[in-house]
Amino acid sequence: MMLAYMDHAAAAAEPDAGAEPAVAAVDAAEFAAAMDFGGLVSARPAAVVRPASSDDVASAIRAAARTAHLTVAARGNGHSVAGQAMARGGLVLDMRALPRRMQLVVAPSGEKFADVPGGALWEEVLHWAVSKHGLAPASWTDYLRLTVGGTLSNGGVSGQSFRYGPQVSNVAQLEVVTGDGECHVCSRSADPDLFFAVLGGLGQFGVITRARIPLSPAPQTVRWTRVVYASFADYAADAEWLVTRPPHEAFDYVEGFAFVRSDDPVNGWPTVPIPDGAHFDASLLPANAGPVLYCLEVALYQRGGGGDGGGDDMDKRVGEMMRQLKYVRGLEFAAGVGYVDFLSRVNRVEDEARRNGSWAAPHPWLNLFISSRDIAAFDRAVLNGMLADGVDGPMLIYPMLKSKWDPATSVALPNGEIFYLVALLRFCRPYPGGGPPVDELVAQNNAIIDACRSNGYDYKIYFPSYHAQSDWSRHFGAKWSRFVDRKARYDPLAILAPGQNIFARTPSSVAAAAAVIV
């Protein structure tokens, strides 16, 4: 085994925990595990565990179970934004330490799958699948330097979600270590309750150590287009029309974002043109354009084998769909790019943020799912009101379909069939001379949430961070009872994912949660 428990953490275990391997102090690793991408929360663990296998993960959880207080959190690439993958005084599993062995699995039916470790980055899965096998998963996140286990524990959304479903709808099998230290292989047909509990389960029911992801032939090139709207009503109507087209009339990817009507390089129209260097002619904007504009972003894939009819056919299909949209004519931008390059497009944002220092600054991000019923009101009150000057980062806003999500998973969604992801991805300017203080930005996020609640919007927080079980009960709504039951079944000691602040490790923790079931 390759466990790296701190001496004092091992000593806290019961006497029979002496069967665990020798331990060593790892101050640097503990410091890293005490922080995350959000930069808003710090919680130092007692130890960092570097598992070499699922057995190591199970051993760490069993060691924690033999104590009265230790908790265990799985940490991927550290991109949580509110301490969700932290374990104050507990054990943090460095899931990136798992061997990066990936395997192509071919079922008797001919279906192909990638069998990958939970600590693998989606970027690693992409390059392995495309370069070695000419295959690819259907559903991605915009940013690929996230772990497989991390996104499957939350949802995993991007512009493909409306058509292919989120990542939690694109997994065939999981290997999971539950809170009792037992390793299970589960799927829709084998131990389905655990399978669906873990998907979107915020790490509460088990640690994903491996996942089996369906594959299909990888596209070769992508027709990537952006168009601009001055009217949110037109933008939303067109976006919703696109995501409800039948497959043979649909794009493969539909996203969009709001931006400020100015030449600000971070918040304004310079963020729109593709390829780099294309000109945004602001004189084409209508005279009645407001302070916030909208960019609809679509992509159509060209696959090999002649099934798409070649580039001319691709251009024809794109043209037919775009002609029906009500964007500002003349403000359209298009590029043909390779499939891997398209999926890796956010890497350039990371590279620039690292250069200017904002990558290391706090990231008070807010992600919401808001029903189509309320999205226009949200636009008026929040995007054109509270955020009319931008957020020093992307303001994503695009629709998805609830029917693409399996209700058996643990993910909490709005009630409406069409709902929007609203992602306010603030990149704080580095000090000195930065933007508003971080606590002001956090307060603004809270004010946005309060506005959603007080106005009665049909919404959910994506990547939620609550501190009271009454809030969690309201968040999960009708799913709360099932969530509590699953916790009692798979992690009765409340050992796992303490940073989510859903259940505390006390003898009565799960029982207390049952008392606030609504």
Curated annotation (Swiss-Prot):
Its EC number(s): 1.5.99.12
Binding locations of FAD: 74, 76-78, 80, 84, 142, 147, 153, 157, 208, 462, 500
Alphabetized InterPro entries for the sequence: Cytok_DH_C_sf, Cytokinin_DH_FAD/cytokin-bd, FAD-bd_PCMH, FAD-bd_PCMH-like_sf, FAD-bd_PCMH_sub1, FAD-bd_PCMH_sub2, FAD-linked_Oxase-like_C, FAD-linked_Oxidoreductases_BP
Keyword Flavoprotein: yes
Gene Ontology biological-process annotations: cytokinin catabolic process
Cystine pairings recorded for this chain: none
Pfam families, alphabetized: Cytokin-bind, FAD_binding_4
Top EC class for this record: oxidoreductase
GO molecular function, one term: FAD binding
Gene Ontology cellular component list: cytosol
Induction (free text): Strongly induced by abscisic acid (ABA) and leaf senescence.
Phenotype of gene-disrupted mutants: Increased cytokinin levels in flag leaves, reduced abscisic acid (ABA) levels, increased branch, tiller, and grain number, and delayed leaf senescence.
The UniProt record lists the keyword Ribonucleoprotein: no
Record's subunit section: Monomer.
Identification of the protein by name: Cytokinin dehydrogenase 11
Native source species: Oryza sativa subsp. japonica (Rice)
Lineage per the UniProt record: Eukaryota, Viridiplantae, Streptophyta, Embryophyta, Tracheophyta
